[in-house]
């Protein structure tokens, strides 16, 4: 058997589509044995973007022996199994797609995805899609907030093609994943950005989604010196796997103020002489601070729950 390095494109029911790095030949891969050489229990042992070592044992089949170290992972917390669920790995950019109209623009979803991107060193870009249908004052105010923080925000439309060329420039020669809630138009965007990628992703989704043209599995596609990864629409984006004491480091607007509080251990909740709190409504948007409080409460509550139920520290 010949050993080689492969990249995972997608996987369904423990069968993976992998592409050999040196030849770009696609194989069907299965994990040899029960588990990979991972250090801890994982919900997603292999995801699109992973690199693996394996043995070719048939013309089109591979035994996957080892997962190589991940440069980064984009994850969310899976409440059903009480574990981090890795969605994609080894990416440069995460395109966070939201809608200017319907479904409703949810800043709470965006804030959580930004936190994971900050934690993992992934460049986040916010796409406000369907702008041809109009942008209300609430959405416009959040666009200004995120731009003020230094995040790149692109207004897009598959109808007028606004912002599409800008997105194409970003993803050129890079590894990029799309993420967003159901109905925000991720698949439609990919369709106008790269038709070949869209068709390939749709074929896989249609085959394994019982005839529905909707993304049900994360799927990677190589095209013109870039890698695009589409992901299923997400209803909830929990980040309970993150420690609540760390949260303040992933809110960009706190970065220059964390050391100006009276106490080094200040969590910016109700401590005296908290400089962060003094900046609410000035350098810090009230909506973002309220988001911080909500997420902080969720993480702290989960910490107590995990300690009681699972004995986790």
UniProtKB/Swiss-Prot annotation:
Pfam families: RsgA_GTPase
Keyword Zinc: yes
Binding site for Zn(2+): 261, 266, 268, 274
Top EC class for this record: hydrolase
Entry binding sites for GTP: 129-132, 180-188
GO molecular-function terms, A-Z: GTP binding; GTPase activity; metal ion binding; rRNA binding
Tree of life domain: Bacteria
This protein's record includes keyword Zinc: yes
Annotated InterPro entries: G_CP_dom (IPR030378), P-loop_NTPase (IPR027417), Ribosome_biogen_GTPase_RsgA (IPR004881), RsgA_GTPase_dom (IPR010914)
Co-factor note (free text): Binds 1 zinc ion per subunit.
Keyword set, alphabetical order: Cytoplasm, GTP-binding, Hydrolase, Metal-binding, Nucleotide-binding, Ribosome biogenesis, RNA-binding, rRNA-binding, Zinc
Domain CP-type G: 80-237
Biological processes, Gene Ontology terms: ribosomal small subunit biogenesis
Enzyme Commission number(s) of this protein: 3.6.1.-
Record's subcellular location: Cytoplasm
UniProt xrefs under Gene3D superfamilies: P-loop containing nucleotide triphosphate hydrolases, Probable gtpase engc, domain 3
Cofactor(s) listed: Zn(2+)
GO CC terms: cytoplasm
Similarity field: Belongs to the TRAFAC class YlqF/YawG GTPase family. RsgA subfamily.
Subunit composition and interactions: Monomer. Associates with 30S ribosomal subunit, binds 16S rRNA.
Cited function: One of several proteins that assist in the late maturation steps of the functional core of the 30S ribosomal subunit. Helps release RbfA from mature subunits. May play a role in the assembly of ribosomal proteins into the subunit. Circularly permuted GTPase that catalyzes slow GTP hydrolysis, GTPase activity is stimulated by the 30S ribosomal subunit.
Protein's name according to its UniProt entry: Small ribosomal subunit biogenesis GTPase RsgA
């Amino acid at each position: 058997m010949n050993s080689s390095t492969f990249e995972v494109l997608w996987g369904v029911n423990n069968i993976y589509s992998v592409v050999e790095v040196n030849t770009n030949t696609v194989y069907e891969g299965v994990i040899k044995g029960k588990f990979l050489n991972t250090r801890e229990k994982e919900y997603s042992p292999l995801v699109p973007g992973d690199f693996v070592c394996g043995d070719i044992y048939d013309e089109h089949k591979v035994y996957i022996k080892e997962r190589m170290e991940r440069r980064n992972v984009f994850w969310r917390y899976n409440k059903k199994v009480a574990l981090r669920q890795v969605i994609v790995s080894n990416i440069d950019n995460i395109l966070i797609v939201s809608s200017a109209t319907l479904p409703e623009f949810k800043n709470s979803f965006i804030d959580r995805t930004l936190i994971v991107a900050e934690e993992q060193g992934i460049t986040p870009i916010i796409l406000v899609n369907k702008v041809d249908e109009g942008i209300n004052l609430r959405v416009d105010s959040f666009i200004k907030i995120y731009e003020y923080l230094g995040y790149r925000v692109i207004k897009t439309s598959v109808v007028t093609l606004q912002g599409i060329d800008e997105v194409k420039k970003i993803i050129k020669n890079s590894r990029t994943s799309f993420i967003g809630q159901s109905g925000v138009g991720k698949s439609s965007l990919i369709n106008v950005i790269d038709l070949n990628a869209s068709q390939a992703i749709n074929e896989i989704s249609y085959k394994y989604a019982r005839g529905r043209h909707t993304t049900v599995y994360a799927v990677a596609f190589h095209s013109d010196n870039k890698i695009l990864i589409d992901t299923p629409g997400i209803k909830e984006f929990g980040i309970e796997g993150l420690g609540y004491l760390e949260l303040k480091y992933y809110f960009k607007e706190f970065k220059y103020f964390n050391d100006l509080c009276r106490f080094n251990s200040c969590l910016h909740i109700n401590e005296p002489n908290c400089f962060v709190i003094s900046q609410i409504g000035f350098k810090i948007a009230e909506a973002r601070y309220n988001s911080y409080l909500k997420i902080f409460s969720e993480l702290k509550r989960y910490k107590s729950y995990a300690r009681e139920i699972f004995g986790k520290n």
